[in-house]
Amino acid sequence: HTIHGRAPTVASGLKLANPELSVWMVTGDGDGFSIGGNHLIHLLRRNFNINVMLFNNRIYGLTKGQYSPTSEQGKVTYSTPMGSLDYPFKPTQLALGAQGSFVAKTIDKELKHLQSMIRRAHDHNGTSFIEIYQNCNIFNDGAFGTLTDRDTKADKLLYLENGEPMIFGNEKNKGIILDGSKPKVVEIGKKYSIDDILVHDETDSLLANMLSDFTAHDDFPEPLGVLYCSERPTYDDLMAAQMGDSKKQPTQTLDDMLNAVSYTHLRAHETV
């Protein structure tokens, strides 16, 4: 975890220094998206082979209950006694915008699902980002109550399975369709059949962005699972290859390196 918000920098250096380590970074909605927000987005875009677990309880827990970057608008806390004016971040949407190669979401009380997401993250070659909804029973108790309550969670959670239709509900009789370019919740068995339901494709970044926006709308279920997964070269692998190429080059002095490219050549390159 390191000091507040700086875990991505330490994790990146650790991975470069010892590539064989399985590096896991634990952060929260406060340090991850405020003081450490710049570090987190660059970790994601660089695609280090590092696993990120972001515990989101929509509050600053360690610093005694101030509102966080994911607190809902209107949230009353010690630091916002009249209600927060800020629009909250959507963590998975932010991770996708930072070009994360693996973006998933789960919740603390769904233990089997949490375990499966951790396994998937471990198996991914690149930066894996898991948002984990976590209840803070001191400063924000019940923040995710409708998603964990036995009587309501079936109608509020959409479990994503790659290649499977997006269905949910106690009777598995609700699903997601595209109405033009917009998602829509429908009931299966009347006007719509299972064949009309949108099928999840975790390699589709446009679909992942659409799903990440469900969080902002009460009439849509909360998607849990792998929203997006793609393979591309990792920063640590590219660095190792670059260092290998460098070692093959003739030995140079500092003056040789400084004079290797002329100022005139640089200016010409910039003009082009």
Where are these regions (language model features)?
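Acidic, Ser/Thr-rich peripheral helices and adjacent loops at domain boundaries
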Residues: 71-81, 148-162, 246-252
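Short acidic, glycine/serine/threonine-rich loops at helix termini
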Residues: 35-39, 45, 62-68, 117, ...
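Conserved thiamine diphosphate
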Residues: 20, 68-121
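Thiamine diphosphate
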Residues: 1-61, 115
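ATP/nucleoside-binding phosphotransfer catalytic cores, i.e., glycine-rich phosphate-binding loops
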Residues: 196-263
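Internal helical hairpin/lid segments
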Residues: 132-224
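Structural signature of the thiamine diphosphate
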Residues: 97-147, 212-234, 240
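Conserved small/polar residues in nucleotide/adenosyl-binding loops
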Residues: 264-271
